A protein has these predicted regions:
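Catalytic His-Asp segment of secreted/periplasmic serine-dependent ester chemistry enzymes
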Residues: 1-48
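A domain-start/cap signature at the N-terminus of enzymes
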Residues: 48-87, 195-199
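C-terminal catalytic histidine-bearing segment of alpha/beta-hydrolase fold enzymes
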Residues: 80, 242, 246-293
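Alpha/beta-hydrolase active-site loop
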Residues: 124-145
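Alpha/beta-hydrolase fold nucleophile elbow
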Residues: 144-156
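Glycine-rich nucleophile elbow surrounding the catalytic serine of serine-hydrolase chemistry
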Residues: 154-164
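Hydrolase active-site cap/lid region
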Residues: 164-210
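The feature captures the conserved acid-bearing segment of alpha/beta-hydrolase catalytic domains
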Residues: 198-250, 254-257
Length: 293
């Protein structure tokens, strides 16, 4: 009162709007719009047109679909929304390389999937990254009502991340699509890539000498996925010089098969690490669609 500060009455505009305050305290989306509109009007003296977005952040367009960019727990987040979502709101999440070799993503959008990116690119599937991914997953269910069974997509190092996340969250996964995936950190980045290797040690909070006992590679921990019969589709080039197939995808395929896990392999002849995916991704998309809950 002494400072003659303006008081904005938000009670009167929201009176008799019980449906917009489900817990009688916190507003839902419509209630938040009413509050924001009233505050804006008092501060500026103007009314303003508004749009209720499906997701937070900056809205733009990606390949003809609505795209939303925002941060969650300090990490870049992108959600691309289908024109007509399928019942249950299925979604595919990749933690690395948004928009790269995205033919399968584009076809899934056309079929009614949400395409989601949450950036864990440079975390090497470490425990903290797995925890961040789980918190992000929970936010997508709680706030946006996406399906509790997510499809995971991992290209290259992203494959390491999605496999490790799935191992710790088997009940949350519909199926996995991995493409030229890193499955063994000793193969890629390997000790020869010294800067990246130091980064691996930092992310995993390990000393060099402790790596002798390292058991964090997904190919050493596939049993929970196999027991759950979690479907995996694996796309690889047989001439991959960056993430060698024989040291990564082949071991994943052989071990998962030996455990009775369902896995489909598409091995591209004379293909290096790039290009990822397939020119016609129908076989990938059909596999994902048939393995939804």
């Amino acid at each position: 009162k002494k400072m003659k500060l303006r008081i904005i009455d938000l009670h009167t505009p929201t009176r008799n709007m019980n449906e917009n305050f489900p817990d009688k305290v916190h507003p839902n989306v419509n209630g938040a719009v009413v509050l924001a509109t009233e505050v804006y009007k008092v501060l500026t003296g103007r009314n303003i047109a508004h749009e209720i977005q499906s997701f937070p952040g900056f809205k733009s367009e990606w390949n003809g679909f609505d795209r939303y960019d925002y941060e969650y727990n300090g990490r870049q987040t992108i959600v691309v929304e289908p024109h007509i979502p399928l019942p249950g709101k299925p979604w595919i999440w990749r933690p690395a390389f948004f928009g790269a070799f995205a033919s399968a993503d584009e076809m899934l959008l056309e079929r009614g999937f949400h395409v989601v990116y949450y950036d864990l690119t440079h975390d090497y599937g470490a425990p903290e990254a797995v925890n961040l991914g789980t918190k992000f997953y929970e936010s997508m269910l709680h706030y946006y009502k996406l399906s509790p069974k997510v499809t995971l997509e991992g290209l290259s190092r992203g494959g390491f991340m999605v496999l490790n996340w799935a191992i710790h969250n088997v009940d949350k996964v519909a199926c996995i699509y991995v493409d030229a995936p890193v499955c063994d950190l000793f193969s890629w980045p390997g000790e020869a890539r010294k800067d990246m290797w130091r980064d691996v040690l930092n992310k995993w909070n390990l000393a060099e000498q402790e790596m002798v006992y390292f058991k964090g590679n997904p190919i050493d921990n596939l049993l929970p996925l196999a027991k759950a019969k979690l479907p995996i589709i694996l796309v690889c080039g047989d001439s991959d010089k960056t993430v060698p197939y024989m040291e990564n995808g082949k071991i994943l395929y052989d071990r998962y098969t030996s455990m009775g896990g369902p896995i489909e392999l598409i091995l591209k002849e004379n293909c290096d690490h790039h290009p990822h995916s397939l020119e016609d991704p129908t076989v990938i998309v059909d596999y994902i669609l048939k393995n939804q809950p």
